């Protein structure tokens, strides 16, 4: 796939995220991740996990009867470790974890970003 094809695919993934976010909360690491996603037009419920234990977030989601979340942790070592811990805890509690969008963002940015907060600037630079 050529670079421009990857970028077109990335834009499609962002559109998919906008639709999915209408019904499913998005798990992110920090408020800058939220700001980046909002600048891209993603609206919805964001859950910032920076300083909250994962089991407490899972408790709250179970209490609210949330069945599925979208996982958008960063692509660095810490983000991968967080993703693994979240998947394990949430699935144990019966909460489906959508990792597809996170995976596709990583692929279609050609590993060009290390974190979700960089996604807006990555897209913006290529559009203008």
From Swiss-Prot:
One of its GO terms (molecular function) is metal ion binding. InterPro entries: TOPRIM_dom (IPR006171), TOPRIM_RNase_M5-like (IPR034141), UPF0292 (IPR022972). Mg(2+) 2 binds at residues 74, 76. Residues 23-105 form the Toprim domain. It comes from the Archaea. Its cofactor is Mg(2+). Mg(2+) 1 binds at residues 29, 74. SMART domains: TOPRIM (SM00493). Binds two Mg(2+) per subunit. Pfam families: Toprim (PF01751). Keywords: Magnesium, Metal-binding. Belongs to the UPF0292 family. NCBIfam families: PRK04017.1-5. This is UPF0292 protein MJ1624. It comes from Methanocaldococcus jannaschii (strain ATCC 43067 / DSM 2661 / JAL-1 / JCM 10045 / NBRC 100440) (Methanococcus jannaschii).
């Amino acid at each position: 796939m050529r670079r421009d094809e990857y970028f077109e695919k990335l834009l499609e993934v962002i559109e998919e995220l906008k639709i999915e976010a209408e019904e499913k909360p998005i798990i992110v690491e920090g408020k800058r991740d939220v700001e980046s996603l909002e600048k891209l037009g993603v609206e919805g419920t964001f859950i910032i996990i920076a300083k909250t234990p994962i089991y407490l977030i899972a408790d709250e989601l179970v209490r609210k009867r949330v069945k599925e979340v979208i996982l958008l942790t960063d692509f660095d070592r810490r983000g991968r470790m967080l993703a693994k811990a979240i998947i394990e805890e949430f699935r144990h509690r019966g909460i489906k974890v959508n990792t597809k969008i996170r995976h596709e963002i990583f692929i279609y940015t050609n590993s060009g970003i290390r974190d979700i907060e960089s996604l807006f600037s990555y897209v913006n630079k290529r559009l203008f």
